[in-house]
């Protein structure tokens, strides 16, 4: 097979592919690993369940893009329906559909991983060149404020009125026109995602990418591994054939749900696999203004209030919360608002008058990925009382900010909705109980389910990513993180994957 991108939906799949390294997952971690290992002269095959979408294929249409770019059409959730679990299913992974934010791992997190989890190799000093390289790979920059949506400006206006510390966020845009549909992919290819950077560099170095390829099991032993794959149809929902990839090594980088799912289906790894899940939940908050805001025009997420982050937390490395401006398309926003019928129509009639934020709140390990009887993932999560309390505090501060910016009312879109019209209403937020299926809590930064540790007694993978108890199986994605990276995970994933891939390349060359 000579194609550098082989679409299994387009022709009869080959019975077998051969490689030195088979990588499962083409997102930030997988594409970066493919780039490094291919440039080291290794034969690399990368498996991706989704399709390849760039340029005009990214239609900006909610129903089409959610169907094709998101796992389970964006409907994946915890078992109790309390948290929506957003994950990419596309060549290039979640970096294709994120809000372009470039947020490195805070120094306090590296220190915490050293001190508490025994990962002495991951010092801030040792990881600094890899973090810097990640920023280069992403063309990290501060976008022109003329391209910001007004929602960002209103958040900053309110923060400054209250004397709160905030900052413009780094992004990975080049040639942005401010279309505002980042969460559905960029049809201008302005987002310098893994698809446009790492995948292309890996292809140039000889790596092959296989799309519409669902990895279902890892078999074999030692240096003779085999990944069993189902070929999918053009829409990615029906199997149309099977093949296998024969490889010396397998690197799993499929995300913190799919990686443990594949290990559990394969009977690989120790009892830590699937445990220690962190979802880093985010709570949306919406503000309504008398004047038009048109927050859907321009970059949706460019400013964050950082006043309430705490880098020196002894237990977690980074704690507190961030308040980050955001905006979605009508399809996205309508699913988050708590009304139905005529009330929903009235609310969406105010779409041009609203601004929104996400309250990003790092969590401690408190969830698990297990298998349903049919092999699909079962995601359970214990939403800790302490985390709920930080959500309430974050909502209180965000409401104060929007009121200071001139909002007529601020709403947490729970059922029933909690609406704040003045600071005298802030105590209403104490009623937020976050019961399952009552509040649209989101997770876009899943971590921790194949925890990296200094010994098998404390985790599932070694500091070099090698799965404890197995030869020839490695994990390079956010599943490894022993505690929350406390940031948007694209940049951490690129940083850590490059570090691990360079180590692996050196080992294989020796």
Predicted regions and their residues:
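Glycine-rich loop(s) and the adjacent beta-strand/alpha-helix scaffold that form part
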Residues: 36-39, 43-45, 50-55, 60, ...
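N-terminal Rossmann-fold NAD(P) dinucleotide-binding loop
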Residues: 30-31
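FAD cofactor-binding and catalytic pocket of flavoenzymes
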Residues: 98, 270-402, 435-437, 443-449, ...
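N-terminal FAD cofactor-binding segment of flavoenzymes
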Residues: 42, 49-99, 105-108, 152-158
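Helix-loop-beta segment of a Rossmann-like dinucleotide-binding subdomain
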Residues: 91, 95-97, 135-142, 166-205, ...
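Rossmann-like flavin
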Residues: 91, 95-176, 359
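Extreme N-terminal leader/targeting segments of oxidoreductases
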Residues: 1-21, 39, 498, 506-510
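A glycine-rich dinucleotide-binding beta-alpha-beta segment and adjacent secondary-structure elements
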Residues: 18, 168-169, 178-182, 216-219, ...
């Amino acid at each position: 097979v000579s194609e550098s991108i082989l679409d299994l939906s387009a022709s009869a799949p080959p019975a077998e592919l051969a490689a030195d390294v088979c990588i499962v997952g083409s997102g930030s971690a997988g594409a970066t690993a493919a780039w490094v290992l291919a440039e080291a002269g290794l034969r690399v095959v990368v498996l991706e369940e989704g399709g390849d979408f760039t340029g005009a294929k990214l239609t900006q249409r909610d129903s089409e893009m959610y169907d094709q770019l998101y796992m389970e059409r964006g409907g994946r959730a915890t078992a109790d329906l309390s948290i929506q679990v957003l994950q990419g299913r596309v060549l290039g992974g979640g970096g294709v559909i994120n809000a372009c934010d470039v947020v490195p791992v805070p120094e306090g997190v590296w220190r915490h991983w050293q001190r508490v989890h025994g990962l002495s190799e991951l010092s801030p000093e040792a990881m600094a060149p890899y973090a810097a390289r990640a920023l280069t790979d992403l063309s990290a920059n501060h976008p022109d404020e003329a391209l910001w949506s007004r929602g960002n400006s209103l958040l900053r206006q309110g923060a400054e009125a209250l004397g709160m510390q905030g900052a413009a966020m780094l992004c990975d845009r080049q040639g942005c026109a401010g279309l505002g549909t980042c969460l559905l992919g960029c049809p201008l290819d302005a987002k310098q995602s893994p698809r446009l950077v790492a995948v292309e560099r890996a292809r140039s170095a000889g790596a092959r990418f296989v799309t519409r390829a669902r990895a279902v099991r890892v078999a074999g032993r030692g240096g003779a591994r085999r990944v069993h794959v189902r070929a999918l149809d053009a829409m990615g929902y029906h199997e149309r054939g099977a093949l296998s990839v024969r490889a010396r090594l397998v690197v799993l980088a499929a995300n913190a749900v799919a990686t443990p799912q594949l290990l559990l289906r394969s009977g690989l790894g120790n009892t830590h696999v699937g445990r220690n899940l962190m979802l880093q939940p985010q709570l949306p908050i919406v503000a309504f203004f008398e004047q038009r805001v048109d927050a859907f025009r321009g970059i949706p997420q460019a400013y964050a209030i950082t006043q309430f982050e705490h880098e020196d937390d002894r237990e977690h490395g980074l704690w507190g919360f961030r308040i980050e401006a955001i905006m979605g398309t009508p399809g996205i926003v309508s699913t988050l608002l708590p009304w139905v019928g005529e009330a929903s129509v009235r609310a969406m009639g105010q779409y041009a008058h609203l601004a929104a934020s996400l309250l990003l709140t790092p969590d401690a390990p408190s969830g698990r990925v297990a298998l349903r009887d049919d092999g699909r993932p079962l995601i359970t999560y214990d939403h800790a009382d302490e985390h709920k309390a930080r959500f309430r505090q974050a909502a209180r501060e965000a409401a104060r900010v929007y009121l200071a910016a001139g909002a007529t009312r601020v709403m947490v879109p729970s059922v029933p909705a909690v609406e704040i019209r003045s600071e005298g209403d802030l105590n209403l937020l104490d009623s937020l109980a976050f019961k399952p299926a009552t509040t649209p809590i989101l997770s876009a930064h899943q971590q921790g389910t194949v925890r990296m540790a200094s010994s098998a007694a404390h985790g599932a993978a070694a500091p070099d990513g090698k799965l404890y108890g197995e030869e020839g199986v490695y994990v390079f994605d956010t599943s490894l993180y022993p505690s929350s990276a406390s940031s948007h995970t694209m940049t951490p994933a690129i940083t850590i994957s490059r570090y691990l891939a360079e180590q692996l390349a050196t080992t294989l060359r020796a």
